[in-house]
Structure formats: C-alpha cells, structure tokens
C-alpha cells in the first residue's frame, strides 16, 4: 500500500508550500515516485487560503466585487499578488502533485482509502490558533479512519504553551499517533506534558534537502535576481516602520532590499532602497534568498533558507510576546551556535543595527541533525505495523 502525506500546502504561504514540496520529494525519494500520495484537501470551506477572495469561484460574485474594491483601496498592487496566487496554484499542481480528488472537508477524510501510513506534518499543523476553519484542528487527524496508522514528522505547535481549553482534545488525539517527531523543543515539552512521552526533535523538511538539491530543484537554469540585494521576507503584516528600518538596513549594506511578504503588501511609502517583490511564487522566493547578499526576516522559513544557502542574516522577532513566532527562531539559533542572534523587531524599527553574520553557524551539528532527521523519517516508515 501507499503512504500518504497530510500537511498544509493549499495556501500562498511560502514556507508551507516549500515544506510540503520538500517532504513529498524526500518521501518519494525513499519510497518511490508513485508510492506517496499528498492528500489534496481544503484548509477552509471556500478554499480561500489558496484561491483568495477576489477571483475565488467559491465566493459569491458580489462579495468578489466588493473584495476587489477593498483590496484596491488597501493594498499595494493587488493584481501582482493575484498573479502570485495563480503561479502558486500551478506550482503546487506540478511540484507537490496532490491527489486528483480534493477533499472539501475533514469529514470527507473518513472515506479515505487505506494507506500503510499517513504522515502528518510538518509546519504549524498543531497550532491551536490556526487550522480551525472547520471548527477543529484537522491536522490532529481525528477525521481519518479509526484504524488508519498515523505518524507525525516535524510537527509544530507554533506556540510555547498550549491553552488549557484544548489540552484534553490534543492529548486524546496525539495518543492515537503511533510515533511523533516535532520541530521544536517547546513542542517536545508540550507533547511530553500531554502524552507522557517526549518525542525526538527533528529538522524542518526544507532542511532535509541540501543547498545543492535546492539548486537542482528550483534555482539552476532560472534567471537570477537583478544585481546584489538583500532578500527581505516578512510573515507578519508589513508596517511603515518596517519599511523605514529596511531602508536604513539597505543604506548600511550598500545594496537595495527586495521585499517579499506572506500576504498582500499594504499601501505604504516605499523609498527607492526598498523594492516590493509582490508576485514572487515559492520557487522565486527560494531563488531570491539563494542569490542574495544577505537576508532580513521575521520568518522561521526565511531563517531556514538563509541557513541552507549560508547567507548572512538578520533574524527579527517580538521577543516580549510569548505568543509570537520568536521562540522558533530563538530555538533554531540556539541549537546551532547562533544564540542571541534573534533581535527584537521593536529595536530594529527604532534604528538599532542588526547583527548580520552566518559565520558562527555550527555546520557540523546541522549536518549531523540532517542525517539524524532523515533516519527518524525512515524509522517512521519502517516501523509501521
């Protein structure tokens, strides 16, 4: 029987699509190109995460018309973001290669054909604040057939503490997994508190591929970015203070900043030093970082790709908010000899120059973890009942 991958990918978020691509590619490399299905499923009832609110055929026409007017008033070049969306849809079909059947709701997964194993993860599949558009976190896999074997690779909770209100639900669901691996130490602690077992911490799927493998997959043969630049990627909504700080960073580095974001860019005053790159699809995002002189990011996956391509980086997070994604950035930097490298984004906005370097990266430890993580993934597959 085949193996199935159940993960986040029907969206325009770069990290989500790229981790799904990397894990599917790795699984297919281990088991065979035709031995792995990526379960094609909606993340919300109208498929808005992938299809958006302007051209989405699942949204009534009058709402699309109203949304188009709102977007035109609020966002910078929404037409380019819609172009990015179209390119992302095409890339997912070609590179992730999900199943022909689209499961419109978690309830439909009860009719899922039997698989030898369903692999859940990676990314923030178990974030209690996300993935609840259907009234529950679908990646807890409670809608899978009861007898279906399930494991988790590099699952992330995205928070350092689980709210008390959902601990019972999570504990019951996670105990049904035969084996779990997580992406962060904080996730390991949460799992241990819920199940009594501390799972191994493994690398994000994007780091299972080497820089050479990423070059072969998405960089080689494609046109490079136009000249030296800083690749900036913001997962939170970009503010004018962010743009102004990036302009100062550009002047400090002596090269322009090419700015990408997880969602549409608001209408802001973009100085000449900051060039919006709104229509970059996930593979263009990788190329931007691979070809950059340095990286500035508040994103976990922005940091991952800076490390993969050994680019000097400024990692920025809200260090005063325990609910922010900063814990993931801090955890990664601490594990690989970059402790203290995550700068508070408020300080960055206030003009404090970031520490930009990659020389301290413990490459030996990172490579050892890559080999170990691949071994853990093989163990998930080989020890099935």
Task: Describe the predicted segments one by one.
Residues 1-385:
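Active-site anion-handling motifs in enzyme catalytic cores
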């Amino acid at each position: 029987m085949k193996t199935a991958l159940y993960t986040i990918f029907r969206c325009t978020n770069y990290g989500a699509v790229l981790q799904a691509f990397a894990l599917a590619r790795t699984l297919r490399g281990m088991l065979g190109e035709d031995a792995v299905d990526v379960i094609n499923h909606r993340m919300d009832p109208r498929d808005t995460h992938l299809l958006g609110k302007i051209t989405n055929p699942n949204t009534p026409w009058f709402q699309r018309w109203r949304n188009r007017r709102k977007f035109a008033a609020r966002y910078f070049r929404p037409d380019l973001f819609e172009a990015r969306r179209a390119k992302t849809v095409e890339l997912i079909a070609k590179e992730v290669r999900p199943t022909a059947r689209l499961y419109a709701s978690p309830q439909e997964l009860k009719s899922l054909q039997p698989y030898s194993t369903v692999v859940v993860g990676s990314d923030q599949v178990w974030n209690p604040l996300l993935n609840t558009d259907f009234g529950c976190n679908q990646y807890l896999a409670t809608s899978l057939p009861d007898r279906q074997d399930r494991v988790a690779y590099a699952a992330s909770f995205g928070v350092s503490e689980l709210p008390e209100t959902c601990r019972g639900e999570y504990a019951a669901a996670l105990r049904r997994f035969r084996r779990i691996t997580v992406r962060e130490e904080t996730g390991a602690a949460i799992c241990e508190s819920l199940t009594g077992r501390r799972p191994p911490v493994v690398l994000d799927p994007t780091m299972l591929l080497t820089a050479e493998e990423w070059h072969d997959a998405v960089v080689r043969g494609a046109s490079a970015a136009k000249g030296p630049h800083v690749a900036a990627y913001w997962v939170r909504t970009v503010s004018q203070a962010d743009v102004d700080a990036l302009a100062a960073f550009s002047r400090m580095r002596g090269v322009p900043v090419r700015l990408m974001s997880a969602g549409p860019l608001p209408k802001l005053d973009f100085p000449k030093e900051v060039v919006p790159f709104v229509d970059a699809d996930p593979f263009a995002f990788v190329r931007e970082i691979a070809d950059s002189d340095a990286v500035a990011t508040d994103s976990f996956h922005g940091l991952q790709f800076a490390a993969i391509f050994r680019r000097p980086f400024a990692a920025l997070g809200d260090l005063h908010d325990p609910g922010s994604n900063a814990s993931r950035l801090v955890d990664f930097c601490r594990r690989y000899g970059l402790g203290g490298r995550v700068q508070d984004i408020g300080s960055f906005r206030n003009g404090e120059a970031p520490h930009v370097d990659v020389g301290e990266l413990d490459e030996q430890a990172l490579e050892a973890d890559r080999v170990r993580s691949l071994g853990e993934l093989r163990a998930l597959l080989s020890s099935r009942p």
